[in-house]
Amino acid sequence: MDTVVDASVIIAVIANEPTKNQLIKLTQKADLIAPASIHWEIGNAFSAMLKQNRITLYQARQALNAYSQIPLRFVNVELEESLKIAAELNIYAYDAYLICCALQYNSPLISLDKALQRIAQAQNIQVIEVNT
């Protein structure tokens, strides 16, 4: 079954955050999909960590190597539909891409972002619960 995954989940797994094992277990049998924009979100997250001196460039490269090992299929989402969703829900485009992806592929969403979870549920998207 396809499952839409967001950057918060990917970062939690590759950064060995406390939810890592649970996230892996919850997605073990899923085919992970994400809009292509997630690639740039991951890069942005690591550049922010570098800027804040939370990680070194070496650690960022190791994390990117771990990221490349995650079986993730990048999918296209309709830009116009995503912008419509962003406008209607008053959300950022990156979140709208995820909502659009889940709707377009009729797939559940897994995220650690509580606001995104609420928005998805309001759109009748199944949200995979993560205990944080």
Listing of model-derived features with the role each one plays in the protein:
Residues 1-37, 49-61, 123:
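Short, well-structured N-terminal submotif of metal-dependent ribonuclease cores
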Residues 43-73, 77-79:
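Active-site-proximal, substrate-binding regions of enzyme catalytic domains
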Residues 31, 73, 126-128:
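Conserved beta-strand segments of alpha/beta enzyme cores
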Residues 2, 35, 99-132:
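Acidic, PIN/NYN-like endoribonuclease modules and their adjacent C-terminal/linker elements
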Residues 11-12, 24, 44, 83, ...:
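A cross-family signal for key residues in well-ordered alpha-helices
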Residues 7, 20, 39, 43, ...:
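A general structural signal for well-ordered alpha-helical segments in protein cores
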Residues 70-108, 112-115:
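Active-site neighborhoods of divalent-metal-dependent phosphate/nucleic-acid chemistry enzymes
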